[in-house]
Regions:
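Active-site-proximal helix/loop capping residues that flank conserved catalytic or ligand/cofactor
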Residues: 15, 56, 83, 197-200
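Helix N-terminus capping/helix-initiation residues
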Residues: 9, 63, 165-166
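Acidic-basic catalytic patches of nuclease active cores, encompassing PD-(D/E)XK
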Residues: 1-42, 49-50
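Catalytic cores of nucleic-acid endonucleases
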Residues: 23, 55, 61-121
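A generic local structural motif
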Residues: 14, 45, 70-74
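Non-catalytic C-terminal interaction segments of nucleic acid-processing enzymes
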Residues: 3, 19, 103-212
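Short hydrophobic/aromatic beta-strand micro-patches
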Residues: 47-49, 88
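Short hydrophobic-acidic sequence motifs that mark active-site Asp/Glu residues
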Residues: 43, 47, 55-59
Length: 212
């Protein structure tokens, strides 16, 4: 029995992330596999190339079980090019359950990360960098106390030093992005689809093969 908490597709959520990062020429590449990453079994639902040349990885989850399964993997987003990791979760997971889960398991976290949340309609809800409220379930301070952050940061420091992408690595990601586009049977709809409709680059023939 499915425990999905959303009707939104992975492609739709990828599109929301792209829009939230600025849309337009924002450098986002969907569905990056172990062919690019050096660690066996590692893959990313979406990576964003930051203005400074690092990678920001987004892990999209559509159910509680899929989110929990990520923390049982032997490989946990440790590629040296990933500067930041974000879990993009259904809004239904925001709140007391996730807060208690973080409190119970933070000593096991192998690196720092944050949460973004998506509702069934509308745009992503992102944590505030300024004016964050520990009582707001969309801000990180709601989930992590200062003590928890310090301990997680200690684990984070054990990871290899992060580095910027080399030119050939950026080129490899651009090629992958083009493959995703031209292998998309619905690419012709991009020109006519409403701006907020999530089709095109972030939708591919593999959609639906696995639950997230």
């Amino acid at each position: 029995m499915s425990d999905l908490l959303t009707k939104r597709s992975v492609a739709d959520i990828q599109h929301l992330i792209w829009l939230s990062l600025g849309g337009g020429s924002t450098e986002c590449i969907p569905n990056v596999s172990y062919g690019f990453f050096r660690e066996k079994g590692m893959e990313a639902d979406l990576v964003y190339i930051t203005p400074y040349g690092y990678l920001h990885e987004f892990e999209i989850k559509r159910s509680k079980s899929d989110f929990l399964a990520d923390f049982k993997k032997p490989v946990f987003h440790g590629d040296v090019r990933i500067q930041k990791l974000t879990f993009v979760l259904p809004e239904a997971l925001a709140g007391e359950w996730l807060k208690q889960w973080c409190a119970d398991h933070y000593k096991e976290f192998r690196r720092s990360f944050d949460f973004w949340f998506y509702p069934e309609e509308g745009m992503l809800k992102r944590p505030r960098h300024y004016g964050a409220d520990p009582k707001c379930k969309y801000d990180l301070e709601y989930y992590f106390t200062d003590e928890m952050v310090r301990e997680i940061d200690e684990n984070d420091r054990d990871l290899p030093y992060r580095r910027r992408l080399f030119a050939e690595e950026r080129s490899a990601l651009y090629r992958l992005c083009m493959i995703r586009f031209w292998n998309n049977p619905r690419r012709v709809e991009i020109k006519t689809a409403p701006k907020e409709q999530s089709i095109g680059l972030f939708e591919n023939a593999d959609e639906g093969k696995g639950e997230k």
